Design a protein with these regions (language model features):
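The feature encodes a structural signal of leucine-rich repeats
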Residues: 3-6, 26-31, 51-55, 68-73, ...
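Exposed regions on extracellular, virion, or secretory-pathway luminal proteins
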Residues: 68-71, 102-124, 167-180, 192
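Leucine-rich solenoid repeat scaffolds
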Residues: 126-203
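Acidic/polar low-complexity surface segments
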Residues: 45-66, 101-112, 117
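Consensus "Asn ladder" position of solenoid repeat domains
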Residues: 21, 46, 64, 89, ...
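Conserved hydrophobic beta-strand positions in leucine-rich repeat
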Residues: 13-18, 38-43, 60-61, 82-86, ...
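Leucine-rich repeat
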Residues: 9-12, 32-38, 57, 77-80, ...
Length: 204
């Protein structure tokens, strides 16, 4: 399954939902260059079959981006997205650390009294994204620092929509993140203005 090349002519497209299409990989045409005005990208539930243990199944063409060799780093470089949904797929491997990506600068952090010092020097990944969902994939390894201290992490309902994985990978690993925090107490130590804000939003 692939998107037609003419999709790239939709330069003014702002919202794209291609969930439930059984893609084996994320279509190459999906780039910020092809969709400069896109702010919401939904790629959820592309599984053709529901397979809990990928190491114990020989079916082909099962969808769920199962042929992606690793987590699609290029999607994480799409800075204009405010919504990114990748839930209920077969993405495997670790979340990339994005060490070569643009970093938060001291000037940016000091210009906003709601941003903590710990951000300085961390990769500035998906800075505008208020909805980020990668739950029910087959991800493993460590959660990267750019995610653990992301300014909008609390808006992402991380224990439901980010940290929660399921099943086993193709090589038989149990899924889940080795450094999943027990709570967000560490986070609110760096974002004290958020903890008692009922909407979990930083003050403008």
């Amino acid at each position: 399954t692939e998107l037609h090349p003419d999709f790239k002519n939709l330069k003014n497209l702002e919202y794209l939902d291609i969930s439930s299409n059984c893609f084996q990989t994320i279509p190459d045409i999906l780039t910020p260059e092809n969709f400069p005005n896109l702010h919401a990208l939904e790629l959820n539930a592309n599984q053709r079959h529901t397979i809990y243990d990928l190491s114990n199944d020989i079916r082909e063409n099962v969808g769920g981006f199962i042929d992606e060799p690793k987590f699609p780093e290029r999607i994480l470089k799409w800075n204009n997205l405010d919504t990114l949904g990748l839930s209920v797929n077969y993405l495997q491997g670790e979340l990339p650390k994005m060490l070569d990506h643009e970093k938060w600068t001291a000037e940016e952090v000091h210009a906003c009294d709601t941003l903590p010092e710990i951000l300085i020097g961390l990769p500035k990944v998906l800075p505008e994204t208020e909805f980020f969902a990668i739950n029910f994939n087959r991800l493993t390894g460590e959660l990267p620092e750019w995610l653990l201290y992301h300014p909008k992490l609390d808006l992402w309902y991380p224990y439901s929509l980010v940290f929660q994985q399921e099943g086993k990978t193709r090589d038989g690993q149990n899924t889940g993140f080795s450094n999943e925090p027990a709570s967000l107490d560490y986070y609110y130590q760096h974002y004290p203005k958020k903890k008692y804000n009922p909407n979990n939003r930083t003050e403008e």
